[in-house]
Amino acid sequence: MASMKSANELLAEEIKDLYSAEKQLTKAIPKMIAGAKDPQLKAGLTAHLDETKQQIVRLETIAGLLEIKASGKVCKGMEGIILEGAEALTVDAPSLVFDLGIIAAARRVEHYEMAGYMTAIAIAEELELSEVTGLLQETLFEEKGAEDSLKSHFAGLLVKAVSGETASARPPAKRTPNVMAKTA
């Protein structure tokens, strides 16, 4: 990271980092869509790709307000998360388990983004940049919505995946003696 002397410079770096992260996602999400088996997952990822493109425009607006260039930085954190998530697309697994892997990777992305947006919001609020704060909060709201949707879909697919396993694949249930029962 370059030498920084002010909170304004820190905010500029955060915006550039978020911009890079969102740009990287516009290339990664289509691969997730192509790999997903579940139609609802495909639809959710497609909707989030459209949202991501709007978030990029919003970050460009913020960069204009801050009189900075949004590009020029590579978000290495998102690079790593995307690289790790790409492994989910190479796993040989039943459809449900495969989709669970995609959702797990997508949830990591959302949490990383939320942390970045919350940090940028805190700085913008302290600098009393209300328009910037509002735009960042709009994106944070979308990211939280995407995470909530992924979390819910993950839970539903997980139940299906677990209930679809054969009884022989599960370890036998251990019976715990009822120590509260009266013995006569």
Predicted segments, located by residue:
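Amphipathic alpha-helical hairpins
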Residues: 1-184
